[in-house]
């Protein structure tokens, strides 16, 4: 087996779905610095394809703004096929938390935007097998 493949196999795999390129870059840079393998999708179809194409997806981080499907619909679609997929939902601070929570599965936490690198790490940490995040 190629050494790069072994390294990737050992690293937590995270898919980030958001149409805002600056948010995606911030999340990817932050989580890659912590040793995670981070993949991005700017639309819902790509996010679904990524989650299914990886032999293991440790976490999906999605936003309300994902081209194609709204982020909540993306989460429900993925959960039908991957019921155990851990998901973290990024939401703009303007959204009503109770209204949003009612639409999400109960085990999907909300990371309120804007957030810092440390807030992102704290939100990701419970989902990553070896505590990276």
Where does each model-flagged region fall?
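Structural signature of beta-strand start/N-cap positions in the alpha/beta core
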Residues: 13, 37, 56-58, 86
């Amino acid at each position: 087996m190629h050494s790069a493949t072994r390294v990737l196999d050992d690293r937590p795999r995270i898919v980030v779905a958001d149409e805002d390129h600056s948010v995606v870059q911030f999340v990817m840079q932050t989580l890659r610095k912590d040793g995670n393998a981070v993949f991005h999708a700017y639309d819902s179809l790509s996010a679904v394809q990524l989650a299914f194409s990886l032999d293991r997806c440790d976490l999906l981080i999605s936003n309300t703004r994902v081209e194609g499907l709204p982020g909540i619909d993306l989460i429900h679609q993925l959960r039908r096929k991957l019921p155990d997929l851990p998901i973290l939902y990024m939401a703009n601070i303007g959204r009503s938390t109770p209204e949003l929570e009612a639409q999400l599965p109960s085990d999907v936490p909300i990371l309120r935007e804007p957030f810092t690198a440390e807030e992102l790490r704290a939100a990701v940490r419970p989902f990553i097998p070896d505590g990276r995040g």
